[in-house]
Amino acid sequence: MGDEALRRRLGRLDRKRRRQKSKVDSEPAPPGRGLPPGEEIDTPFGPAFLIQNQYPMDYKHGRNRLADILEFDTSIAAEVARQPSLGETSIERLVFIDTETTGLVGGAGTIAFMIGIGVFRDDAFVLRQYFLRDPGEERGMLTALQGDLESAEGFVSYNGRAFDLPLLEMRYMLGLRHQWSLSTWPQFDLLHPARRLWRMSLPDCTLGTIEKMQLDVHRTEEDVPGSLIPGLYLDYLRSGDASQMARIVYHNEVDILTLVGLATQILNRHQYQDSSELSGSEALAVARWHQEVGRLDAAEDAFLRAIKSSKPDVRVDALHRYTAYLKSQDRRDEAIEKWQTLHSLSPDDPRPCIELSKYFEWHANDLAQAQQWAQEALVCLSHWEDGWRRDQVWGEIEHRLGRLARKAGDG
């Protein structure tokens, strides 16, 4: 069912319920049959339903204990996430957050019917999941959540900056008339670091794929695909039968535990002193990170690991970036062999040939070699389809050859 159709059905259901009850905020429908055990919390805006679990610090989720993440300083997270403000807090002050919603694309008609948060507290990891038993309880749920976040200083999420937190901001505005800029808080959004590390080695970078292939997390049959969750919740609202809600609770619970494990793995990769322990794609991502923050020796070490990758696409990307790095350091002599390797790996790419032509013209003063590599660049370009980009590059190379011919003639 599309998100728009789901919103319309949810809206019709909500309007029907409001007609049937004049005090929906203070007198919500009782929990449905089969709802997981939890407690009802009283707030000034009505009740909220909370499911809470506590995990010992040595609890192992996949490859890591929950406590492992506490070994890292947030200064690393600040660099990885490009969020300097993260370095001013601590892991213990961050909230691991994930929501389950009535739609997968956001918008004013989308409601977060489950909000899960995890925090480190008193030598344990405390997981609190707020479940919306009835749409009329949303104000109570948001009020209770607000109390939980009063002592927080930032978030850890997976695409929370773009989805979960803007959605919650909207719900606070619509439900409580409260403008709360949650998306401006310090955030360690794991989506982008995960993509940088593994987009070239995994079939996709969904949380489910990453947790299985990088964290060794395997969910039980109790789990439910995320795409089915909005429909299951709508069925619950229509029927009152909450027997499937335990699967959603489990899904959200594992998501949050995975956030802890994934953050640990990402920070671990970026703190490795020896790049030989990294895969090629990981080394390339780490090299770029070190280069961005000015740790050039560490960047070079990681680049050298990445160019040894067994994956051709990783190796080619690494060679392009490493030769650009060598050029920026005025170490072109060291780049010659790498450009030649790039040409052999990507015979349709004229860029390595053009760089070699430039080198031999301007730095080695070998016009014959410069002409040879410019001609080779045209051979590469001849494999391209006709188009403006091909014509543009072809013209640039011919201009180069013309200049080289004049230089050779003058000589």
Segments (PLM) and residue ranges:
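N-terminal accessory regions of nucleic-acid-interacting proteins
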Residues: 1-91, 286
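Conserved DEDDh/DEDDy metal-dependent 3′-5′ exonuclease domain
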Residues: 122-217
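Acidic, Mg2+-coordinating catalytic module of metal-dependent nucleases/exonucleases
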Residues: 196, 202-277
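Structural register within alpha-helical repeat arrays
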Residues: 286, 321-322, 356, 370, ...
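Residue at a conserved register position within TPR or TPR-like alpha-solenoid repeats
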Residues: 290, 326, 360-361, 405
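Short coil turns that delineate tetratricopeptide repeat
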Residues: 311-313, 347, 382
